[in-house]
Swiss-Prot record:
It comes from the Bacteria. It is a single-pass membrane protein. The gene is secE. HAMAP family: SecE. This is Protein translocase subunit SecE.
Amino acid sequence: MAEDKKKAPKDSFFKGVISEMEKTSWPTKEEILKYTTIVIVTVVFFLIFFYALDLGIGKLIELIS
């Protein structure tokens, strides 16, 4: 049954991990810089958008009250 199966040695696991890491295509430095810039610009855009929205709603509530 399940107890009868031999367990794979630890080095077999690490060899598998290394093998899979070698198959992975890693982004280049330029790609990382490009994607990081896109993320930062997007975050800043939404920061400004929601800040302006918050100010607008605050002023609207102030006018109503």
